[in-house]
């Protein structure tokens, strides 16, 4: 049987790191076995859907390199790929289960259900539906329907059954039917509940494997019960439940923690290298056998094995993510870097305004985390209004290196050219004249020309600062040095 996996987000928010991980692992599993990866939109929670939620899922997954074989953007024979287009179908199947006595109409009011829940909590019991409507006679049911009394449809759980599955990540899991409640499968507004719709969709789309977060473990026995009621072959689908992702304090990632950027869009906006995020996310709970860290998408597919997914919490380490991004910026080609800088919203206007911006940016290519940092570094290094720091002046004075600055200034004034090569020649001449080398040569020149004690390649930095700015800085510091 062909491997078919799916990622089925709800458009109630934007693509989260956790969702990106789920999508990536399902994608890798499918591609590792020449299978298909499907994106299905579960949009039945109408009140919570947000504008742009669907586009966020697709756009940022594609930004990470994850493209679906089938979806609303690439529909094939297993559609519709969005649940809101299948509402009548779900309703018909729910009513069919009622006709088969596998499900029943529930006319209980919200007040009655709330009272039952409050009583259970008071008695320290797990709230369960009391089956008030399970055995209503046909006459009562028809009278309620004729009176347009509001109802839901509930599945009748077999309390004597054991709902078990061999989890791909956690091994065998069993939940007794007695621990479950009769779940609502169709709401009063005729919209299918999540657990009902997802079972139907997975079956009809011939999904073979479902990898998802551990919060769905509690949904699985209900989905197995629904599948049994619908006479679906339970052997045709395998479930695997991923570990949680925790922050630096060991707490589960919370979208309410605004101090930690958790949405893929945050990293795209800041100008991270896209595959760095994909690479980082891949290792949130997966350990390749060869312990390789830097991997292309092709290498991820080649190495992926569901048996190497961990059930232990995955640590979201922002420093590790930044490390990945720096590694990629360091390793990509100059042409790739230039194209990225030219086209990214953060930098494309700067490229148009400053013809030397690309050249300046290239000085930092091997060291940056993202383009947001790049902009700050370029501005910091090439800001013509930068202030001279007292500690830098003292460094030159205390090490008796004023003569290095003086000679560099004198040589630069008489130099006919001002380009990278001529600047290097001036520095060589200063070395010969002052007998200084290493830090005693380069540090005072850097401080005097750039008003900074650190930075990229010195000759290039001086060149892109411009002759006028460099001479102005030299004159200023020489006055201070006396």
UniProtKB/Swiss-Prot annotation:
The keyword Nucleotide-binding applies. Keywords: Aminoacyl-tRNA synthetase, ATP-binding, Cytoplasm, Ligase, Nucleotide-binding, Protein biosynthesis. SUPFAM superfamilies: An anticodon-binding domain of class I aminoacyl-tRNA synthetases (SSF48163), Nucleotidylyl transferase (SSF52374). It holds the Pfam family Anticodon_2. GO terms for molecular function: ATP binding; glutamate-tRNA ligase activity; tRNA binding; zinc ion binding. A motif ('HIGH' region) lies at residues 9-19. It is found in: Cytoplasm. The keyword Manganese does not apply. One of its GO terms (biological process) is glutamyl-tRNA aminoacylation. Its EC number is 6.1.1.17. Belongs to the class-I aminoacyl-tRNA synthetase family. Glutamate--tRNA ligase type 1 subfamily. Catalyzes the attachment of glutamate to tRNA(Glu) in a two-step reaction: glutamate is first activated by ATP to form Glu-AMP and then transferred to the acceptor end of tRNA(Glu). This is Glutamate--tRNA ligase. The lineage of its organism: Bacteria, Bacillati, Mycoplasmatota, Mycoplasmoidales, Mycoplasmoidaceae. The gene is gltX.
């Amino acid at each position: 049987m062909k491997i078919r996996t799916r990622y089925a987000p709800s458009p109630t928010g934007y693509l989260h790191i956790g969702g990106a991980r789920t999508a990536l692992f399902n994608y890798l599993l499918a591609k590792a076995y020449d299978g298909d990866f499907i994106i299905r939109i579960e949009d039945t929670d109408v009140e919570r859907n947000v504008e742009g939620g669907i586009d966020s899922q697709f756009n940022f997954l594609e930004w990470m390199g994850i493209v679906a074989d089938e979806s609303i953007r690439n529909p094939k024979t297993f559609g519709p790929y969005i649940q809101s287009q299948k509402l009548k179908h779900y309703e018909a199947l729910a009513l069919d289960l009622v006709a088969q006595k596998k499900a029943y109409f529930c006319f209980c009011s919200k007040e009655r259900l709330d009272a039952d829940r409050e009583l259970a909590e008071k008695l320290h019991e797990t709230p369960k539906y009391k089956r008030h409507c399970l055995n209503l006679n046909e006459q009562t049911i028809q009278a309620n329907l004729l009176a347009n009394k509001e109802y839901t449809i509930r599945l009748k759980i077999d309390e004597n059954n054991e709902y078990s599955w061999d989890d791909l990540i956690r091994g065998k899991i069993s939940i007794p039917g007695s621990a479950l409640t009769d779940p609502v499968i169709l709401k009063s507004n005729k919209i299918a509940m999540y657990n009902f719709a997802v079972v139907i969709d997975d079956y009809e789309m011939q999904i073979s494997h479902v990898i998802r977060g551990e919060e769905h473990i509690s949904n699985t026995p209900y989905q197995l019960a629904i599948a049994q009621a619908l006479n679906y072959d339970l052997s045709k689908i395998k479930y695997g439940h991923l570990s949680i992702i925790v922050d630096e304090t060991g707490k589960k990632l919370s979208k309410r923690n605004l101090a930690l950027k958790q949405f893929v869009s945050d990293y795209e906006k800041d100008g991270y290298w896209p595959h760095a995020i994909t690479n980082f996310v891949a290792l949130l709970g997966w350990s390749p056998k060869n312990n390789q860290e830097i991997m292309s998408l092709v290498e991820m597919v080649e190495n992926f094995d569901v048996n190497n997914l961990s059930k232990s919490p995955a640590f979201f380490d922002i420093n590790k993510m930044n490390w990945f991004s720096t590694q990629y910026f360091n390793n990509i080609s100059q042409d790739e870097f230039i194209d990225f800088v030219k086209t990214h919203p953060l930098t494309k206007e700067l490229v148009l305004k400053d013809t030397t911006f690309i050249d300046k940016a290239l000085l930092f290519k091997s060291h940056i985390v993202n383009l947001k940092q790049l902009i700050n570094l370029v501005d910091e290094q090439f800001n013509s209004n930068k202030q001279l720091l007292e500690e830098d002046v003292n460094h030159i004075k205390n090490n008796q290196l004023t003569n290095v600055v003086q000679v560099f200034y004198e040589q630069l004034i008489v130099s006919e050219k001002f380009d990278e090569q001529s600047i290097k020649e001036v520095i060589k001449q200063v070395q010969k004249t002052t007998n200084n080398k290493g830090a005693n040569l380069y540090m005072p020149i850097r401080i005097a020309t750039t008003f900074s004690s650190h930075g990229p390649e010195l000759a290039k930095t001086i060149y892109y600062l411009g002759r006028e700015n460099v001479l102005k800085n030299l004159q200023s510091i020489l006055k201070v040095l006396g």
